[in-house]
Amino acid sequence: MKLNTKYHGSIEYEERDVIYFEKGIPGFEELNKFIIFPVEDNEVFLVFHSIENEDIGIIVTSPFNIEKDYEIQLEEEQITNLKLQDEKDALVLNTVTLDSDIDKITVNLRAPIIINIKEKIGEQIIINSDKYKVKHPLFKEEA
């Protein structure tokens, strides 16, 4: 199958690549089917893209690229919804807010996207804690 994206050109994917989000994601509750693909010539960022709306693609990254000790505790209901049997089946991604000023690029560490890579289902959760920021700087200033 082929997805013609607004910013990333034509992307080939297969049905097995599609990740289903029963509730959509905050702000896009009506969109349930997404794929993930790499940003060209970039090892840090991925694109989390709707296959139902060619204009909706979000840059994401692994939180472990930003915070090596990143840790979240899923509630029992979230584990059940995601059908997670083993934590190694969970892929954790966080949304990135881009800016032309590299120092203003931020990562939302408080609302991770959790994907069961075995079952191909996902959910974006909100962490009810001040431990992580919604606008965490991607690049920290050197002291």
Curated annotation (Swiss-Prot):
<dbReference type="InterPro" id="IPR024046">
    <property type="entry name" value="Flagellar_assmbl_FliW_dom_sf"/>
</dbReference>
<dbReference type="GO" id="GO:0005737">
    <property type="term" value="C:cytoplasm"/>
</dbReference>
<comment type="similarity">
    <text>Belongs to the FliW family.</text>
</comment>
<dbReference type="GO" id="GO:0006417">
    <property type="term" value="P:regulation of translation"/>
</dbReference>
<comment type="subunit">
    <text>Interacts with translational regulator CsrA and flagellin(s).</text>
</comment>
<keyword id="KW-1005">Bacterial flagellum biogenesis</keyword>
<dbReference type="Pfam" id="PF02623">
    <property type="entry name" value="FliW"/>
</dbReference>
<keyword id="KW-0963">Cytoplasm</keyword>
<keyword id="KW-0810">Translation regulation</keyword>
<keyword id="KW-0143">Chaperone</keyword>
<comment type="function">
    <text>Acts as an anti-CsrA protein, binds CsrA and prevents it from repressing translation of its target genes, one of which is flagellin. Binds to flagellin and participates in the assembly of the flagellum.</text>
</comment>
<dbReference type="GO" id="GO:0044780">
    <property type="term" value="P:bacterial-type flagellum assembly"/>
</dbReference>
<protein>
    <recommendedName>
        <fullName>Flagellar assembly factor FliW</fullName>
    </recommendedName>
</protein>
<dbReference type="InterPro" id="IPR003775">
    <property type="entry name" value="Flagellar_assembly_factor_FliW"/>
</dbReference>
